[in-house]
């Protein structure tokens, strides 16, 4: 996988089409999880569960930001054994799986949850492992404009989308301030240009979902 390209290409989708992901792609995802997906703490037991749209009613009562759940044709649950580093390990693994889905031209959206037991009960899961991460995935709604990132270059070129069903990424100029909020004076001079390590560090931060 070309991680740099996938990190730049990925986007967090807020509206999915009803089209289901082909079984072949789902099989590739499972194989990747079993054989390739890196673990920060290999000794932590994990399990990957792929759900279809039929799971949405159960998830609506147990997951989502302030009980608002993103509807999708599929949901990915990463289960984990209890461990002091379970959250970090699961986050690392799921983000890698998100990049794999991006490589397969499949869109994703992380979902918020606070109660693993509530989700397990809603889905009738009997595994002793805990819900550690949830991602909705499928094919995002098509928009009139394909431009995705609102990343402003050092030469002030701004790329924007007029209509979108995804969360746009922030430009370096939107993220970075000089000594006080909203002060951009001297920002370009401080970071020099694209090969400047400071600019590259801020650009990397701007690629987060």
Predicted regions and their residues:
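Acidic, surface-exposed loops and disordered segments
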Residues: 1-209
């Amino acid at each position: 996988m070309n991680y740099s390209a996938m990190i730049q290409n990925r986007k967090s989708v807020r509206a999915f089409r009803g089209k289901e992901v082909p079984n072949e792609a789902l099989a590739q995802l499972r194989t990747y999880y079993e054989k390739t997906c890196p673990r920060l703490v290999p000794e932590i037991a994990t399990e990957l569960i792929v759900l279809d749209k039929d799971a949405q009613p159960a998830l609506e009562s147990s997951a989502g930001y302030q009980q608002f759940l993103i509807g999708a044709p599929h949901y990915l649950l990463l289960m984990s054994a209890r461990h002091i580093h379970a959250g970090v390990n699961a986050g690392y693994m799921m983000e890698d799986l998100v990049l794999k889905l991006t490589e397969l031209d499949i869109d994703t959206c992380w979902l918020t949850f606070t109660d693993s037991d509530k989700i397990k009960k809603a889905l009738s899961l009997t595994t002793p492992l805990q819900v550690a991460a949830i991602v909705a995935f499928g094919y995002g709604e098509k928009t009139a404009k394909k431009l995705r990132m609102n990343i402003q270059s050092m030469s002030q070129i701004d790329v924007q989308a007029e209509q979108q069903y995804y969360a746009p990424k922030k430009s370096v100029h939107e993220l970075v301030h000089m000594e006080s909020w909203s002060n951009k004076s001297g920002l370009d001079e401080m970071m020099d240009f694209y090969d400047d390590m400071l600019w590259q560090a801020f650009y990397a931060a701007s690629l987060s979902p």
